């Protein structure tokens, strides 16, 4: 059975249904010239868990990855995506739709049935650049508890786009009334705040949108800490230290955060009205399980960089925050990624004068 394929470096198009029903195909290696992935090209490829869209890919055909095994999808703003591209990807757990940088970039809509039947997808953030959500876009996403909308004005919404989902839609507090005034959106469960109950004194949080922690119902806002920008990953297998933690009441998108509060207390937070730009230099560098690391140095050892998709995981061992698994290059070779996984950790400096945190509870 076909498990791995290395396509020619000069290949520009993967034809319609080229690898359809290749049920054992797990790895696809292609060059930097590929522009088009045809209709149904990887349909029914259940073993294909990961597929990284390189910068050259501009067109993704209808049903391109329908019923594939993808678990994580990072899209690009300059892509045109056909209908039902990821339909029935039942293992899909994370989707990144980037904000487009200008009006000429075509990723401004969620196409018809694009994620329909993705039953494991728990949340998604739609950037302000999304102006249309088409029919059945998320129909049947039974686990979709959080749909985060960053646009100030309601997008054009097909009435069945969120059928057979929890229909929980979160918007900016200042824009809630605008969404309530739109009949299509008002038929959903519109909300402007989230709640988080802490089971231990310290916890972690990951969001791919700016977050503001607010006082509500007589409770103070929980305390959040982010790492200083001096932290840098140089060797993925080495333990690094966060030398200083900064206390904040808002966090920028894609930042790992440590929360402090009272156990068994419910705290409130919401989408920030403006990006938390003041925190741009307070980056910590943990990663989500499906994140790819990119090697930038010819020595094959140092200066790995991360895609903007991070996640902290607390361990039972006090004062250690494990970052989960990160997929790295085995060789510093163009077009090669994701071959090996490693675990690495961050340690908190336990000096209260610099961190404000004495211990971390699992």
Could you describe each region identified by the protein language model?
Residues 231-234, 354-362:
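C-terminal outer-membrane/trafficking sorting elements
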Residues 192-217, 247-311, 315-354:
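A short, polar beta-strand/turn micro-motif
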């Amino acid at each position: 059975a076909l498990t791995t394929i290395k396509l020619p470096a000069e290949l520009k198009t993967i034809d319609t249904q080229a690898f359809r029903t290749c049920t054992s195909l797990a790895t696809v290696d292609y060059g930097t010239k590929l522009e088009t992935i045809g209709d149904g090209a990887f349909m029914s490829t259940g073993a294909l868990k990961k597929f990284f869209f390189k910068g050259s890919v501009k067109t993704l055909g209808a049903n391109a990855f329908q019923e594939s095994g993808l678990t994580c999808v990072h899209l690009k703003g300059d892509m045109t995506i056909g209908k039902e591209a990821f339909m029935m990807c039942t293992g899909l757990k994370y989707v990144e739709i980037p904000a487009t940088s200008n009006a000429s970039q075509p990723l401004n809509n969620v196409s018809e049935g694009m994620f329909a039947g993705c039953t494991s997808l728990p949340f998604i953030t739609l950037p302000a650049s999304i102006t249309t959500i088409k029919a059945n876009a998320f129909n049947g996403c039974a686990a979709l508890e959080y749909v985060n909308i960053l646009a100030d004005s309601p997008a054009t919404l097909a009435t069945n786009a969120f059928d057979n989902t929890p229909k929980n839609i979160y918007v900016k507090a200042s824009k809630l009334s605008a969404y309530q005034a739109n009949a299509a959106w008002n038929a959903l469960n519109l909300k402007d705040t989230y709640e988080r109950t802490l089971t231990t004194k310290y916890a972690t949080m990951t969001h791919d949108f700016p977050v503001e922690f607010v006082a509500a119902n007589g409770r103070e806002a929980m305390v959040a800490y982010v790492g200083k920008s001096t932290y840098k990953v140089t060797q993925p297998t080495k333990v690094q230290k966060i030398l200083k933690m900064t206390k904040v009441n808002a966090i920028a998108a894609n930042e790992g955060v440590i929360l402090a509060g009272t156990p068994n207390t419910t705290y409130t937070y919401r989408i920030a009205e403006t990006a938390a730009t003041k925190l741009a230099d307070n980056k910590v560098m943990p990663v989500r399980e499906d994140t790819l690391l990119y090697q930038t140095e010819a020595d094959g050892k140092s200066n790995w960089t991360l895609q903007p998709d991070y996640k902290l995981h607390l361990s039972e061992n006090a004062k250690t925050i494990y970052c989960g698994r990160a997929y790295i290059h085995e060789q510093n070779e163009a077009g090669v990624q994701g071959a090996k996984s490693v675990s690495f950790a961050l340690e908190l400096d336990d000096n209260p004068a610099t961190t404000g945190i004495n211990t971390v509870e699992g």
